C-alpha cells in the first residue's frame, strides 16, 4: 500500500523506529512501516507528533490534509528537487509563445478525451445515442476551431468552457435520477455525484503536484492557467488531461453500487452534500486500487513535459 488514509478522530500518531504507530486511548492500535509509503492523507482532526511529520518528509512521503468534509486543507512535501535549471527554463517558457502552443495542445487533448468518453456513453446508454451524437458533433467543431483558427488563451478558455458544458449535459444522463445529478456544481457540491467528482479532482490535483515536485518543476508556474498567488497553476494545467479518467471512475463507483445515496449526508447550513464516514471507508480502498493503474500514466506525462521544458531527449536525474 503506497497511500494510507487516516480518518479517525480518536487516533494519535507516533514514530516507532521506521514505522508510524497508531494509538487509541493511550493503547497501541496498529502500525505501518514507512518503506512502502508515498502518501499519507489525514482527514479531520487527528493528533500527530511533530516528529512524525519530520519522519514522513525525510522519507519523501507527501502528507495531504483534508477537512472532515474532504475539502483541501494543506499539503506537506519535502524540499524541491535540486535541478534549479529546469525551473528557470520553465519560467522562461511561461513568458514565451510556448504557453499558447502548449495550451492549445492541452485543451485539444482534453476535448478529444471528452468526445471519446461520449462515444462510450453512446454505447452504454442506447437511449442517449442521439444526444451523444449531437454533443460529439459540437466537440468535433471545438477541436477543429482549436486546430485551424487563430486563437488566444482567453478565447481558448471560452471554447473549453462551452465544450465542458455540453459534455456534462450528456454525462449527467448516465446516472440514475435518484442521485439528482443534473450539472456540474462545485462549491458546495449539491448531490452525491458532484461530491465524488470534487473529491476525486482534489485528490488528482495533489497527486499531480507531487509528481511535478519530484521531477523538479515548479507547480505554481503554469501555461494555460496563468500564475495566481497561492495556486499550483501547472498542476491545474496537467490535471485537465485526466479529468475524464476521474469522470469514468466516479461513474463506475455508482454503476457498481459501491456508493449510493445512503453513503452521503447533507450539510444543512451550506446545502452541500458530502461523503459520510461509512462511505469514506468504502471509497478509500477503491480509490487506491484505481489510482495504482493511473499513477504511471500521470508520472509519464509529467516527465514528458519536463523533457519539453529542457528540450532534451532524456529525463533529468539526480
Curated annotation (Swiss-Prot):
Give the top-rank taxon of the lineage listed in the UniProt record for this protein: Bacteria
Q: A GO biological process this protein is involved in?
A: CRISPR-cas system
Q: Which UniProt keywords apply?
A: Antiviral defense, DNA-binding, Endonuclease, Hydrolase, Magnesium, Manganese, Metal-binding, Nuclease
Record bears the keyword Electron transport: no
Is NAD there in the keyword field?
no
**MF (Gene Ontology):** DNA binding; endonuclease activity; metal ion binding
| Listed Pfam families | Cas_Cas1 (PF01867)
Q: What does the record give as cofactor?
A: Mg(2+); Mn(2+)
What residues does Mn(2+) bind to?
A: 160, 225, 240
- Enzyme Commission number(s): 3.1.-.-
Q: How does it assemble?
A: Homodimer, forms a heterotetramer with a Cas2 homodimer.
Q: Which family does it belong to?
A: Belongs to the CRISPR-associated endonuclease Cas1 family.
Task: Please give the function described in this protein's UniProt entry.
Answer: CRISPR (clustered regularly interspaced short palindromic repeat), is an adaptive immune system that provides protection against mobile genetic elements (viruses, transposable elements and conjugative plasmids). CRISPR clusters contain spacers, sequences complementary to antecedent mobile elements, and target invading nucleic acids. CRISPR clusters are transcribed and processed into CRISPR RNA (crRNA). Acts as a dsDNA endonuclease. Involved in the integration of spacer DNA into the CRISPR cassette.
Q: Per its record, how is this protein called by name?
A: CRISPR-associated endonuclease Cas1 1
Could you tell me which species this protein originates from? Thermodesulfovibrio yellowstonii (strain ATCC 51303 / DSM 11347 / YP87)
Gene name? cas1-1
Amino acid at each position: 500500500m503506497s497511500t494510507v488514509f487516516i480518518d479517525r478522530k480518536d487516533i494519535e500518531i507516533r514514530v516507532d523506529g521506521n514505522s508510524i504507530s497508531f494509538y487509541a486511548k493511550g493503547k497501541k492500535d496498529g502500525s505501518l512501516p514507512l518503506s512502502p509509503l508515498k502518501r499519507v492523507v489525514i482527514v479531520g482532526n487527528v493528533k500527530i507528533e511533530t516528529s512524525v511529520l519530520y519522519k514522513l518528509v525525510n522519507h519523501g512521503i507527501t502528507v495531504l490534509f483534508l477537512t472532515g468534509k474532504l475539502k483541501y486543507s494543506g499539503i506537506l512535501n519535502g524540499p524541491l528537487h535540486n535541478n534549479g535549471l529546469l525551473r528557470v527554463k520553465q519560467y522562461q517558457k511561461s513568458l514565451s509563445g510556448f504557453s499558447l502552443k502548449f495550451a492549445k495542445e492541452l485543451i485539444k487533448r482534453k476535448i478529444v478525451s471528452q468526445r471519446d468518453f461520449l462515444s462510450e456513453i453512446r454505447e452504454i446508454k442506447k437511449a442517449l445515442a442521439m444526444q451523444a451524437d449531437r454533443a460529439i458533433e459540437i466537440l468535433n467543431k471545438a477541436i477543429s476551431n482549436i486546430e485551424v483558427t487563430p486563437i488566444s488563451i482567453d478565447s481558448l478558455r471560452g471554447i473549453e468552457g462551452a465544450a465542458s458544458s455540453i459534455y456534462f449535459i450528456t454525462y449527467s444522463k448516465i446516472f440514475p435520477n435518484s442521485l439528482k445529478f443534473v450539472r456540474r456544481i462545485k462549491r458546495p457540491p449539491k448531490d452525491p455525484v458532484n461530491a465524488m467528482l470534487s473529491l476525486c479532482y482534489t485528490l488528482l490535483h495533489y497527486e499531480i503536484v507531487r509528481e511535478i515536485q519530484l521531477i523538479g518543476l515548479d507547480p505554481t508556474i503554469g501555461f494555460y492557467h496563468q500564475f495566481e498567488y497561492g495556486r499550483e497553476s501547472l498542476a491545474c494545467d496537467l490535471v485537465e488531461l485526466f479529468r475524464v479518467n476521474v469522470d469514468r471512475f466516479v461513474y463506475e463507483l455508482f454503476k457498481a453500487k459501491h456508493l449510493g445515496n445512503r453513503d452521503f449526508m447533507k450539510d444543512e447550513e451550506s446545502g452541500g452534500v458530502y461523503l459520510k464516514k461509512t462511505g469514506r471507508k468504502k471509497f478509500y480502498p477503491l480509490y487506491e486500487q484505481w489510482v495504482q493503474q493511473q499513477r504511471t500514466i500521470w508520472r509519464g506525462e509529467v516527465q514528458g513535459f519536463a523533457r519539453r521544458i529542457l528540450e532534451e531527449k532524456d529525463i533529468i536525474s539526480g
